[in-house]
Amino acid sequence: MKFDDLRDFIGQLEERGLLKRIKQEIDPHLEMTEISDRTLRAGGPALLFENPKGFDTPVLTNLFGTTQRVALAMGQDDVAALKEVGKWLAYLKEPEPPKGIKSLWEKLPIFKQVLNMPTKKVRSPACQQVIMEGDDVDLTKLPIMTCWPGDVAPLITWGLTITKGPYKKRQNLGIYRQQLLGKNKIIMRWLSHRGGALDFREWQEVNPGKPFPVSVALGADPATILGAVTPIPDTLSEYAFAGLLRGSRTKVAKSISNDLDIPATAEIILEGYLQPGEEAPEGPYGDHTGYYNEVDDFQVMTVTHVTHRENPIYLSTYTGRPPDEPSILGVALNEIFVPILQKQFPEIVDFYLPPEGCSYRMAVVSIKKSYPGHAKRVMFGIWSFLRQFMYTKFIIVCDDDVNVRDWNDVIWAITTRMDPSRDTTLVDNTPIDYLDFASPVSGLGSKMGMDATNKWAGESDREWGTPILMDKKVKEKIDDLWQDLDILS
């Protein structure tokens, strides 16, 4: 199913009973977070707050609060079907020419979808129906949520930040949180390895001291939003991937104050620049770890223009101890990771990022083990293959008889197939999430790999245990008798 814009998606969710309109007056300061959090933990609907206290603009939260809604936003019926999206990305990351008629036929759906990758330019976009600039710009009029009692200021959480470096043809779209500083100032909190930060550094190399143009889209269509959080190849534009997801070309328009392309159907657009050297302390904020983060200096964005649709909707979220919206997205995106990893490492059977691990800090993987040391190869392969796993602190590798999504199975494998000294690999001085205060140095820490596989000759000199399995014929006989025995009724 295709969704041309956020409003189209809202309408479809409402028809399915997956969106609830809140007509009571609710304060964006803390109250919306509490309602959204209770709703998400109960597996409830997306929420449209129609009467935010002190503001005229309605607020949409919990949009991706269930894996079902994430799948729908990606044009799929359920989360399991997202593996097909992963297969597209695996192919686009390392394309192979068809090896015959059968191969051509199998790849035909991908080739057809590629036609939707180029963007479509729009001259009079909906996102520029209302234009404000200069003294008319006032970000304090937006119902920006303050999510937790210790948060220093209101925080923009779903800002789709658009940048372009001097060396790349494509633009970068990334989601970075943005602290409200004043009427026309926000802090751009991006980590040094993220696309926007890389573009900014390269810009300063070529244009020292000159302002760096930036546009921020709030409330883009769901395919474009999810394109910015999906592990696409570095050479692929998020707009192009959104076209693949949507099944139609992404509509973009030129920003008013710069040459950046913005989502034409977005609800609200912020345009402006980063002046090199202008920084401000960011935070503290409650984050997806369940803790408040440290205060650190980040670049300040000066907003020169605000454009929006008539009667815009403000898209927002909160982050906190899982489950929250980022962790739900992580569960859904997990299905996309599996085919990408399997293309590089065919021995991988399954891969799982437990949501309790704050989306990416722990991974459990099962493999068809083929030789001594195989588990260690897979550990280092995962850490280095995709940028998303640079910050994964713990990787547990199991055999293919272990269900990596069942902690009962995983803990059994750890406790019966591991020796803590022999089967634990520690790596020092590796990149770690800036928000990880447990690391000894900000942004730098260690990683642990755990080999919970059966050990082969060369890995252990002892006779290895054989798992207990019931005789197959006995199981079949009892299967036939089970209902008649009437034991559990």
UniProtKB/Swiss-Prot annotation:
Q: What is its main location?
A: membrane
> Which GO BP annotation is one of this protein's?
ubiquinone biosynthetic process
Q: Which residues bind prenylated FMN?
A: I175, Y176, R177, R189, W190, L191, R194, G195
Q: Which GO terms of the cellular component aspect does the record hold?
A: cytosol; plasma membrane
Q: How does it sit in the membrane?
A: Peripheral membrane protein
Q: Which GO terms describe its molecular function?
A: 3-octaprenyl-4-hydroxybenzoate carboxy-lyase activity; metal ion binding
Cofactor(s) required for function per UniProt: prenylated FMN; Mn(2+)
> What is its pathway?
Cofactor biosynthesis; ubiquinone biosynthesis
Q: SUPFAM superfamilies, alphabetically?
A: FMN-binding split barrel, UbiD C-terminal domain-like
Which residues take part in binding Mn(2+)?
A: N172, E238
Is Metal-binding one of the keywords UniProt gives this record?
yes
Q: Where in the cell is it found?
A: Cell membrane
Question: Which cysteines are cross-linked by disulfides?
Answer: none
Look at the named UniProt entry and state the broad enzyme category this protein falls under.
lyase
- Subunit architecture: Homohexamer.
Function text: Catalyzes the decarboxylation of 3-octaprenyl-4-hydroxy benzoate to 2-octaprenylphenol, an intermediate step in ubiquinone biosynthesis.
Similarity annotation: Belongs to the UbiD family.
Q: Which PANTHER family match?
A: 3-OCTAPRENYL-4-HYDROXYBENZOATE CARBOXY-LYASE-RELATED, FERULIC ACID DECARBOXYLASE 1
Q: Which HAMAP family match?
A: UbiD
Protein's recorded name: 3-octaprenyl-4-hydroxybenzoate carboxy-lyase
According to its UniProt entry, this protein's organism is Psychromonas ingrahamii (strain DSM 17664 / CCUG 51855 / 37)
